[in-house]
A protein has these predicted regions:
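Metallo-beta-lactamase
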Residues: 74-129, 134-142
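Core dinuclear metal-dependent hydrolase active-site scaffold
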Residues: 35-98, 165-172
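Divalent metal-coordination and catalytic microenvironments
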Residues: 2, 14, 48, 86, ...
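Structured loop/turn residues at beta-strand edges in well-structured enzyme cores
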Residues: 8, 27-30, 46, 67, ...
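Short, glycine/charged-enriched secondary-structure capping and boundary segments
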Residues: 4-6, 29-30, 63-64, 96-99, ...
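Active-site metal-binding motif and surrounding structural segment of the metallo-beta-lactamase
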Residues: 1-25, 31, 98-105
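Binuclear metal-ion centers of metallo-dependent hydrolases, dominated by the metallo-beta-lactamase
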Residues: 13, 21, 25-40, 120, ...
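Short glycine-/acidic-enriched loop or helix-start segments at secondary-structure transitions
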Residues: 1-3, 24-26, 60, 92-94, ...
Length: 172
C-alpha cells in the first residue's frame, strides 16, 4: 500500500502489529506504534484495539512476511468502529461484536477474503448498527455488486448497510 509514503509525507502516526511496526520504523516511518492482538493503544480522544484477522500478510519487496494481520476496533467520539481488513469469516467475530459496534467495515470481494454470503453471517455475529462493505471491485477476481450485498444485509439481518463510492465519506 501507500502507508510508508503517506506517513513520511504527513507525519501521521501508524498503528500496526509488532513485526509490521518494526519494519515500518526500519523504512523511516517517523511515528509508529507497534502493538499486538488483544492490545489496546490509547490516544487523546480514543483508542485502537488490535484484533485477529484471518489472512496472509506480505510486503512485495522480496515477499517479506511482516507478521500476522490484524483488524481494528477504533473508539473515538463516543463511537466504536470495527475495521475487519482482509479476512475470512471466523467465529471469534462474535467476541468482537461484544465491543458494542456502531459500525462494521467488512470485505465482500470473495476470492481473497470473505464474500457477500459470509459477510452477512459476520453481520449476524457482530450485530453493528451499520455495515459498510469494502475490498471489492478493484480488480476482476473480486468483482461484486455492493448494492446486492446491501439488499442481502438489510433483508436477512435488519442492519442498515451503507455503500460508499471511492472518495465518498459518511459523518457519524
Amino acid at each position: 500500500g501507500d502507508t510508508i509514503s503517506i506517513a513520511k509525507r504527513t507525519g501521521a502516526t501508524v498503528i500496526a502489529t509488532f513485526e509490521l511496526g518494526t519494519f515500518l520504523s526500519q523504512q523511516g516511518v517517523p511515528n509508529v506504534i507497534a502493538g499486538n492482538h488483544g492490545g489496546t493503544i490509547s490516544f487523546p480522544g480514543g483508542s485502537v484495539k488490535l484484533v485477529p484477522a484471518w489472512h496472509t500478510s506480505s510486503y512485495s519487496d522480496n515477499f517479506l512476511a511482516p507478521g500476522v494481520p490484524a483488524g481494528l476496533v477504533v473508539r473515538f467520539g463516543g463511537k466504536t468502529i470495527y475495521f475487519a481488513g482482509d479476512t475470512c469469516l471466523f467465529s471469534d467475530m462474535k467476541l468482537i461484536g461484544e465491543e458494542g459496534l456502531d459500525v462494521a467495515v467488512l470485505p465482500i470481494g470473495d476470492f481473497y477474503t470473505m464474500g457477500p454470503a459470509d459477510a452477512v453471517k459476520a453481520v449476524r455475529f457482530l450485530e453493528p448498527g451499520l455495515v459498510i462493505p469494502c475490498h471489492y471491485n478493484t480488480f476482476p477476481p473480486i468483482k461484486q455488486d455492493p448494492n446486492r450485498f446491501k439488499e442481502m444485509v438489510e433483508e436477512q439481518t435488519g442492519v442498515k448497510c451503507l455503500v460508499l463510492a471511492p472518495g465518498d465519506s459518511h459523518e457519524m
